[in-house]
Amino acid sequence: MSTFLQDNGDLSAVLVKFAPFAVAVIAILAAWKFTGSSKPRKVLNPSEFQNFVLKEKTDISHNVAIYRFALPRPTDILGLPIGQHISLAATIEGQPKEVVRSYTPISSDNEAGYFDLLVKAYPQGNISKYLTTLKIGDTLKVRGPKGAMVYTPNMCRHIGMIAGGTGITPMLQIIKAIIRNRPRNGGNDTTKIDLIFANVNEEDILLRDELEKLAKEDDGFRIFYVLNNPPPGWNGGFGFVTAEMIKEHLPAPAKDVKILLCGPPPMVSAMKKATESLGYTKARPVSKLEDQVFCF
């Protein structure tokens, strides 16, 4: 009996001695299982709005800023398919009901823990003006994803894009996804991209540095700028985007070609007519994924 007690006493001493090490090993294994084997959590909900906290604001100009909103966990992702957008909602003084508008983040699911919105504040823009009133720590109501466009690698051979002003945001999302998935980066996307980007003044060209960096590193992406009020010595287009510019700088109509449009309504309307006159399939009032001319 005494031998049994002695043996158990020795065993207890061993357990006490090595217990901290066992706890540490278990903790490490648990952490590995949580961070190494689990997929990032997608937080968007298409059926209900959720509140996200503004964590950072970066002013780009007097009326343009990038708003960074935190996701609940640093490992969370928005869960937004490439080509889709989100709805923002706010109660605005003087409006009879909640105002809802669509925006495309300039960040992607490759960046965890937050999402970025590039917003230009228009005098008549309810949501854009509302965003300028937000302070760090304030919340914004967001729902999604939504939209008919879901980009997949090599869905067509060549994409032509026409963007005006903040209409560059869905284009940038797709451009970055294509370049990120090039063969040299371990992917398989060989889609060519040509972009016509229209603005009023040269200083209005949003995300210009990022766009030109992408064009410099990728020979499958080209940009043609168009300005209403070009400065002296400007070597891009001037005035409004014309059918002649589209013919010169975008891919010709073909089954494996898609044209994407996003910008102010008058511009999009004019571009629908211009593309149709050049032989592209007539754009529908509400675009579908399979359309040759797709309007965001």
UniProtKB/Swiss-Prot annotation:
Limits of the FAD-binding FR-type domain: 47-152
List of residues binding FAD: 132-147, 158-195
Domain of life: Eukaryota
Family of this protein: Belongs to the flavoprotein pyridine nucleotide cytochrome reductase family.
A Pfam family annotated for this UniProt entry: NAD_binding_1
CDD domains in alphabetical order: cyt_b5_reduct_like
Reaction it catalyzes: 2 Fe(III)-[cytochrome b5] + NADH = 2 Fe(II)-[cytochrome b5] + NAD(+) + H(+); 2 Fe(3+)-[Dph3] + NADH = 2 Fe(2+)-[Dph3] + NAD(+) + H(+)
Gene Ontology CC: endoplasmic reticulum; mitochondrial outer membrane
Subunit structure: Monomer. Component of the 2-(3-amino-3-carboxypropyl)histidine synthase complex composed of dph1, dph2, dph3 and a NADH-dependent reductase, predominantly cbr1.
MF terms in GO: cytochrome-b5 reductase activity, acting on NAD(P)H; NADH dehydrogenase activity; transferase activity
Keywords for the protein's UniProt record, in alphabetical order: FAD, Flavoprotein, Membrane, Mitochondrion, Mitochondrion outer membrane, NAD, Oxidoreductase, Transferase, Transmembrane, Transmembrane helix
Name this protein carries in UniProt: NADH-cytochrome b5 reductase 1
The organism's taxonomic lineage, starting at the top: Eukaryota, Fungi, Dikarya, Ascomycota, Pezizomycotina
Organism: Aspergillus terreus (strain NIH 2624 / FGSC A1156)
EC number: 1.6.2.2
Transmembrane segments: 11-31
Major place of residence: mitochondrion
Membrane topology: Single-pass membrane protein
GO biological process: protein histidyl modification to diphthamide; tRNA wobble base 5-methoxycarbonylmethyl-2-thiouridinylation
Subcellular location: Mitochondrion outer membrane
Leading EC class: oxidoreductase
UniProt-listed InterPro entries: CBR-like, Cbr1-like_FAD-bd_dom, FAD-bd_FR_type, Flavoprot_Pyr_Nucl_cyt_Rdtase, FNR_nucleotide-bd, OxRdtase_FAD/NAD-bd, Riboflavin_synthase-like_b-brl
Cofactor: FAD
Pathways involved: Protein modification; peptidyl-diphthamide biosynthesis
